[in-house]
């Protein structure tokens, strides 16, 4: 349902009443997407025909191949929109970071399921962390911060395998501090951290260990606040800096970096409750919203199907996520269960980041909406991720053994 709805909206996003291209025409993105859809059906057939145990057996080998591809694309890849993350072979283009998501989830599932020690142990957690940190860094080196953030979502797999919640809270604090540093006076923020640390020290009483922890945390927080300028100006690329600043102040450059989000919000808002009707979107017809078949496909739904259509789409995604969680929790093998959590993490990250980006709650980072946006590499990646899990679920009553 998501794929067909996405295909129809890809056509709507490019529809021009003066040209009258058929939805099946290969001159349109919708026509080309149809090729990817049918090829995905072929992928599903292959997945279902293969022995379910092979995914466990080849996980490390496939992970290694993905790492090699991520390294190779740094040297031989094609640069698109500031990111060197594509292999180009004539008219065929391939993004290895998409299929590498599958490789990373496989490797994490195998590692945690085969561990002879408790998965909550620090050494096991660190190794699991490194399994997705390495490709995450390689993707960052390609200049694709959005996809790197998707890899970061696999931290929830660590959480499912016993990672202490304090680590997740710490990561959230880092994000909040980063945002506050951009919007608030740096001196006032540091004073606030010091006062908060003093309050905590007063509450913990005479516990030296807790007092030292509060002091170290405060010093680390202050150090991070002071380093944000370096991160923003020296680590992020110019186009990424502009995207972050446009989130803080979208009106600073309404005709430049802020144009995409502004027009997307106008399109969504103009749809009202019921929308303007299929193929009747004025923002869409006159190409006000850039990249509307890919990154901003949700704005097409908002304009033409309105608030009701947007809610229905979100409900479909939530239903999918809840179903994946249910299936993961009923697995008889650790490999299948952990793999399911990984699939859920990847899909949810794409869903949340794409919609947040479209409505102006997150910087524009080039993240497709799963099964919905135009693109062959992403559709193949999502198809493989999901249907391998469904294949494992179909054999859940059998003990997963290495071939």
What are these regions (language model features)?
Residues 8, 79, 84, 260, ...:
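Gly/Ser/Thr-rich beta-alpha loop segments that engage phosphate groups in nucleotides
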Residues 8-16:
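Membrane-helix interface motif
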Residues 94, 263, 371-372:
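Short hydrophobic beta-strand that contains or immediately precedes a catalytic carboxylate
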Residues 144-149, 276-281, 292-294, 356, ...:
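Transmembrane helix boundary and interhelical junction motifs in multipass membrane proteins
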Residues 3-4, 8-9, 23-255, 302-359, ...:
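Hydrophobic alpha-helical transmembrane segments of multi-pass inner membrane proteins, especially
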Residues 354-403:
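A juxtamembrane structural motif centered on a specific transmembrane helix
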Residues 243-297, 305-309:
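TM-adjacent membrane-interface loops and short helices in multi-pass inner/ER membrane proteins
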């Amino acid at each position: 349902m998501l794929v067909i709805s996405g295909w129809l909206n890809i056509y709507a996003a490019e529809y021009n009443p003066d040209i009258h291209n058929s939805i099946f025409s290969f001159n349109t993105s919708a026509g080309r997407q149809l090729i990817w859809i049918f090829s995905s059906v072929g992928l599903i057939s292959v997945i279902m025909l293969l022995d379910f145990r092979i995914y466990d057996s080849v996980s490390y080998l496939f992970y290694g191949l993905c790492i090699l591809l991520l390294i190779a694309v740094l040297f031989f890849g094609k640069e698109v929109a500031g990111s060197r993350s594509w292999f180009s072979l004539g008219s065929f283009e391939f993004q290895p970071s998409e299929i590498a998501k599958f490789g990373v989830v496989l490797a994490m599932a195998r590692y945690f399921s085969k561990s002879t020690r408790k998965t909550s142990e620090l050494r096991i957690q660190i190794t699991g962390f490194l399994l997705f940190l390495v490709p995450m860094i390689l993707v960052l080196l390609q200049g694709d911060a959005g996809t790197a953030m998707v890899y970061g979502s696999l931290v929830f797999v660590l959480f499912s395998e016993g990672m202490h919640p304090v680590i997740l809270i710490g990561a959230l604090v880092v994000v909040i501090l980063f945002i506050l540093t951009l919007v608030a006076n740096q001196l006032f923020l540091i004073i606030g951290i010091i006062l908060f640390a003093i309050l905590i020290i007063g509450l913990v009483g005479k516990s030296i260990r807790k007092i030292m922890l509060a002091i170290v945390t405060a010093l680390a927080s202050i150090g991070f606040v002071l380093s944000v300028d370096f991160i923003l100006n020296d680590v992020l690329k110019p186009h990424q800096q502009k995207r972050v600043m446009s989130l803080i102040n979208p009106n600073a450059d309404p005709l430049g970096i802020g144009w995409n989000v502004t027009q997307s919000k106008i399109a969504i808002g103009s749809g009202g409750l019921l929308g303007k009707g299929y193929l009747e979107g004025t923002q869409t017809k006159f190409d006000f919203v850039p990249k509307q078949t890919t990154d901003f496909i949700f704005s097409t739904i908002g304009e033409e199907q309105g608030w009701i259509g947007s809610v229905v789409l979100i409900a479909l995604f939530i239903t999918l996520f809840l179903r994946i969680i249910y299936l993961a929790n009923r697995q008889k093998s650790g490999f299948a269960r952990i793999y399911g959590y990984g699939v859920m993490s990847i899909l949810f990250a794409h869903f949340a980041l794409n919609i947040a980006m479209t409505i102006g709650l997150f910087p524009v980072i080039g993240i497709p909406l799963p099964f919905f946006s135009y693109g062959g590499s992403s559709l193949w990646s999502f198809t493989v991720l999901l249907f391998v899990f469904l294949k494992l679920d179909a054999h859940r009553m059998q003990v997963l053994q290495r071939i």
